[in-house]
Amino acid sequence: MERLATVRARLQEWERAFARLHGRRPAKGDVEAAPEETRALYREYRNLKQAVRQADDRHRVLEQSLAEAAEEAQEPSCWGPHLSRAATQNTQSMPKQSLLSSVQDYGKRLKANLKNTTQTGPTQSRKLQLQKRSLSTVPAPRPPGSKTESPCPDEADDALPRVPEPRPRLGQLQQLRSSLSRRLTSLDPGWLERCHNRVSDLLEVPGACGLDLSAEESQPQMSGKVNIADPDIQSEVSVQSPEAIAQQPAQVLSQSPKSINSKGRKRKWNEKGEDFAQDQPSSGAGPLSEGARATVHGQDPPGEPTQVNVPQPCNSSNQARTEKAKGTTHLHASPRPASLDRGNYIRLNMKNKRFVRVGANRGRLLRKQVWKQKWKKKQAAFGGSGPRATDKDTCFRCGQFGHWASQCSQPGPTLTVQEEGDRDDKQPISTLEEVAQRTGTASCHHSGEETQPAAPELQVPHCPTPMSPLYPPGPLGQVAETPAEVFQALERLGYRAFRPGQERAIMRILSGISTLLVLPTGAGKSLCYQLPALLYAQRSPCLTLVVSPLLSLMDDQVSDLPSCLKAACLHSGMTKKQRESVLKKVRAAQVHVLIVSPEALVGCGARGPGSLPQAAQLPPIAFACIDEVHCLSQWSHNFRPCYLRVCKVLREHMGVRCFLGLTATATRSTARDVAQHLGIAGEFELSGSANIPANLHLSVSMDRDSDQALVTLLQGDRFRTLDSVIIYCTRERIQNGWLALLRTCLSMVGDSRPRGCGPEAIAEAYHAGMSSQERRRVQQAFMRGHLRMVVATVAFGMGLDRPDVRAVLHLGLPPSFESYVQAIGRAGRDGKPAHCHLFMHPQGEDLWELRRHAHADSTDFLAVKRLVQRVFPPCTCSQRPVSKSSPEEVKEHSGQQTYPVLGQACLGHERALPVQSTVQALDMTEEAIETLLCYLELHPRHWLELLPWTYAQCHLHCLGGSAQLQALAHRCPPLAACQAKWPPKDTSQGRSSLEFGVVELADSMGWKLASVRQALHQLKWDPEPKKGAAQGTGVLVKFSELAFHLHSRGDLTDEEKDQICDFLYNRVQAREHKALAHLHQMSKAFRSVAFPSCGPCLEQSNEEHSNQVKTLVSYYFEEEEEEEETMTDTQGPKPGQTQLQDWEDQIRRDVRQLLSLRPEERFSGRAVARIFHGIASPCYPAQVYGLDRRFWRKYLHLDFHALMHLATEELLLRGR
């Protein structure tokens, strides 16, 4: 039988492949034309079927001989005729009476059976129990293809054990006779009449020849045996004639209700066992095709059991099968039990739920409950829509409350197994061509077809017309003189005159000219966008967008605006109600200035939390202001990549043509990069520079113990009396208990001022590991003067508007000159003297920490290549015409380089890159991957276009089964296209759930992603509800797996992909080298003017030393244009490079030890070097590898690239 199942499975696999290839089932001629191996399988299948049939015939003859031998066997009798073996006779030997005649004397035979039962007594019941136990050993019918074995003669003899002669007890015959009289009087004549009517209806059923009289559901007529639902005897008889069926109702009804109830539980167990066997079909389940049956020369198909075939006169249509199932249900009714006197007991219906609570409502609560129920019933009459049907508390069939689908009496859409299979056969899955014709989209296609039409090009949203300037510039672009209207607006804002640089910048914005303004911290940069916004709003309803980097900075900017200027902010930290209120005011043109984060601006139209709506829903935008514009050049790389797309989104989606950039620190190279983003053509003039105010006194020292030096400095005369101090250091240093040491040491120093005049607290921490409420509390306490010192990271202080900050201290080297200038610029804004000091480590530990961040953003060429392969997968669009000119090699991202324009046959496809899987595959952070994608979007060739993030996978589950899924596909084009694009592998069994890619489906259909998502969401609700309220369909639709969403071409050549890889890798390498060069240059500059210790800085500041530091910083910002020539000279020999030879042997041993301890990991040279430097990555997190201090941060003082080179050599030697 195992070989038969194997051969059947292979033949069915060949037939399915033939059907997919030719669109039809194979015929006899196709089988003869098949390969020799296939024909040999058909011949072997025929021989195996014949062998199985012969074995079944021998088994049937053996059973008949055993039955005849049992009839002829004579038993010694001394108790009368009640010991005869008539009850053990086979049902096949019963007299063949007509079904109609048996109905007429139904009651007579029932009484006769009851009388015989009385005569036989307990002996007959014992025989029946033994016979039941013996017959239970006969194998039940198994599904096709299952392994069966014919019983041997010995087992057949054991199936009929000899029954020992029982000894009757005295008085038992009289008890049985009395019980007979009671049971005869309890018979209901109406019940006999109903039985007569039911059996008469049975004669009218066209498919009655194949009925199953068991309590199970009607199964397809696969075998010629019928299971008799006898509670005491379970046997299988061959259906030979209608007369044999006429005997079965009498046997069913001849048992007492008590016996039926007592055996019901065991009967259920047997049925579960049979169902469990049937629920495990073999790989060859299912009939062969018609051509295959013709090939086997009239033999049974392999999907049917090897039983005696019964001629079925019934029709094979769905209507006949439904009538057959209805006819079967009449015979499943159990007889009515006799009325019994149960005394003080009642019957509980456990199928219906009854809720009885201890604390039931009484009195006022009960009257209120009744009042609510009454008005719920009147709700429809008063215009209400009734309770809304949900998926949790309503029936999936009828949509009513109070019951589940299993107790529903109304016919629902759910089908039986047979009807569901018939519907699957009658309703095949639509092809892609049919779906395209039905939906009107000609772009539904397979991903592997060569004739696939190109996907439609991504349409850019219509940009609104830009606003005209308030004061148009002259013919040569000159700015007009400042009119009196501008000065009047200045007075309305509370100012009397302009500060240096403000007037020129404001007039350029009012003339519609993009401007980059660089002013020191506290010089009034906010006025440069407030005044133009007010004047534009006075002329016509419009909006001014301000892009701000921090949420706390947004709140401060809104609160500091004058009352005549209406402003609001929009970010992800707001509640849904707050966002809706702000958007409502913006649409109504009640807001003059809208402050948003770059993430909210880039994700406009994505309907995410804190995202900005589309430009069509907003008033005309006068101009856009980007505060802290240096973030476009510094923060945009691997930290906040959305900054790279801010100007592109404003220009292409919002229609903005005038930009204003505000910053306090911008070198020459940073200014050129920012000007390129803002679209400032030609030479630009920096209004102001990063000049350090004269009231700041700077000093630098290199102390061996920086903690003790800080305490000594704060206890000195120079810093002892200062009330507001900001101390910048790393987060690790704050969390290592250093803050407690600072509080303890400073509390022991007495304060000469009177009680109540100074701050209440000494020092508090501020870093990203704290909650937002705690950070806000610390900042407010510092702003109100209740806190003397704030020990924080570099995130604190941006947008801080406290003019009397008296001191700023740095524990360690700052990240850059720009960061240092911004930090010290927060002190002394009131013009009074302020002090700033920098502590450096003499051994360079602070420089080592900063180098870690530069190396963390770099990646390998192999990771870049994998990303390019994921972004530009090949498509089947027709090839482009070959251009005569060859593409030039991409070297740098410069707008001056020209590229040949080639004819494009592929207009691009929408793709989704799952974030989590992409991060793990490339071992890169989300920000680093998005940065590389932004590089490709901003490239002159425009390799791709980034879209808002989306959920790529859709999981759809139908509670109604595969029939409901097929019905929904006819009214939902995306679902039909999904089934046609990804057909199920096994079509014999229906499926009720689907999981597919939404972006890929939308691209193949040519639809927008939003339309596809909306169509799938509509499947959860009934389009034609029976009531006024919306009703659920029982369909669950869930979107998951957040992914990068982009639009890219699929016809790039290998040369173009190599150019993209080189371009991205060169950009990453250039950023890393530039960051390292700046760090070394800054470290060298500060070391040249640093004191060996803080001793000279304790009492008073050194003016000469302060001027040296100021000159050094100003030189960096003014002479930045020579950076490219001096970068290699400035970098010089790398620190730690000369010590590598002394550590080489130890490094190699540690690499080998690391590889042996973790053989399951696939390390790379960069991964090993990151572990030695303490750099976490997605595949090698610090929470796991940071626990092993034998390797983590062990070689931080050595060069990163040298470690990576040694690790790569060891990996190659070990073959990994």
Curated annotation (Swiss-Prot):
Please name the CDD domains in this protein's record.
DEXHc_RecQ4-like, RecQL4_SLD2_NTD
Binding residues for ATP: 519-526
List the biased-composition ranges (Polar residues): 86-100, 114-137, 248-262, 306-320
One GO cellular component term of this record is: nucleus
Q: Which residues carry this modification: Phosphoserine?
A: 179, 181
Query: Where found?
Result: Cytoplasm; Nucleus
- Primary localization: cytoplasm
Q: Which GO terms describe its molecular function?
A: ATP binding; ATP hydrolysis activity; DNA binding; helicase activity; zinc ion binding
Q: Give yes or no: UniProt keyword Hydrolase.
A: yes
Q: What happens when the gene is disrupted?
A: Early embryonic lethality. Transgenic mice with exon 13-deleted RECQL4 are severely growth-retarded and show high (95%) perinatal lethality. They exhibit various skin, bone, intestine, tooth and thymus abnormalities and premature aging features, but have normal sensitivity to IR and UV irradiation. In contrast, transgenic mice expressing a truncated form of RECQL4 exhibit mild perinatal lethality, no growth defect, but show defects of the skin and skeleton, aneuploidy and increased cancer susceptibility.
Q: Where are the transmembrane segments?
A: none
Q: Where are the CCHC-type Zn fingers located? A: 393-410
Q: Which Pfam families match?
A: DEAD, Drc1-Sld2, Helicase_C, zf-CCHC
Q: Which SUPFAM superfamilies match?
A: P-loop containing nucleoside triphosphate hydrolases (SSF52540), Retrovirus zinc finger-like domains (SSF57756)
Name the coenzymes or cofactors required: Zn(2+)
Please, which domain of life does this record's source organism belong to?
A: Eukaryota
Q: Where is the Helicase ATP-binding domain?
A: 506-684
Q: Which GO biological-process labels does this protein carry?
A: DNA recombination; DNA replication; negative regulation of sister chromatid cohesion; pigmentation; positive regulation of cell population proliferation; sister chromatid cohesion; skeletal system development; skeletal system morphogenesis
Positions that bind Zn(2+): 875, 877, 906, 909
Please provide the record's keywords in A-Z order: ATP-binding, Cytoplasm, DNA-binding, Helicase, Hydrolase, Isomerase, Metal-binding, Nucleotide-binding, Nucleus, Phosphoprotein, Zinc, Zinc-finger
Q: Which PANTHER family match?
A: ATP-DEPENDENT DNA HELICASE Q4, DNA HELICASE RECQ FAMILY MEMBER
Q: Briefly state the protein's biological role.
A: An ATP-dependent DNA helicase which unwinds dsDNA with a 3'-overhang in a 3'-5' direction. May play a role in development of the palate and the limbs. May modulate chromosome segregation.
**Record's family?**
Belongs to the helicase family. RecQ subfamily.
| Summary of subunit composition and partner proteins | Interacts with UBR1 and UBR2. Interacts with MCM10; this interaction regulates RECQL4 unwinding activity. Interacts with TOPBP1.
Q: What is this protein called?
A: ATP-dependent DNA helicase Q4
**Gene for this chain:** Recql4
